[in-house]
Amino acid sequence: MGNRCARTSCCRKLWSCICCCSNNNNNSYGQTRSQHGSKGKVHPVSRIEKWEEKITEANNHGKILVVNFSAPWCVPCKKIEPVFRDLASRYPSMIFVTVDVEELAEFSNEWNVEATPTVVFLKDGRQMDKLVGAETSELQKKTAAAADLFLRKP
């Protein structure tokens, strides 16, 4: 519960407080940050036109699109942000974007985003995997698995 924030505005402050006070010891933030200090290319998406540009780019080049649905007030979102950047650096064959759920609320609802952060993995515009919450080790595993699938493509 402390690794994700509810998206409803009435619960936002309560969730932020709960998330901020949680202590999750099964993340590798410090390890990832120290091993990979460079910033990866994460494309911010706050307009539907930018989304369409990135999904078209991924589809045209046969790349996996990794989408981080995030909110500026979400403490767990801030926790995974450096890990997400690091993954973008490590996996240049994938496209990493962060969608601002406040700027694109209706769009986020279409993707069934009920809490932040939610990370969705897309191939050819279709969801292949999803992670809800700031479980950094799980995010790393799912990203590595998606990259492995990309490398095995026919």
UniProtKB/Swiss-Prot annotation:
Is Ribonucleoprotein there in the keyword field?
no
Q: Tell me yes or no: is Amino-acid biosynthesis among this UniProt entry's keywords.
A: no
List the active-site residues: 74, 77
Start and end of every Thioredoxin domain?
Answer: 24-148
- Cellular localization per UniProt: Cytoplasm
Q: List the disulfide bonds.
A: 74-77
Q: Which InterPro entries match?
A: Thioredoxin-like_sf, Thioredoxin_CS, Thioredoxin_domain, Thioredoxin_H-type-like
Keyword annotations of the record = Cytoplasm, Disulfide bond, Electron transport, Redox-active center, Transport
- What Pfam families does the entry give? Thioredoxin
Question: What GO cellular component entries does it have?
Answer: cytoplasm
What SUPFAM superfamilies does the record point to?
Answer: Thioredoxin-like
Can you tell me which family this protein belongs to? Belongs to the thioredoxin family.
Q: What exactly does this protein do?
A: Probable thiol-disulfide oxidoreductase that may be involved in the redox regulation of a number of cytosolic enzymes.
Question: What name has this protein been given in UniProt?
Answer: Putative thioredoxin H10
- The scientific name of the source species is Arabidopsis thaliana
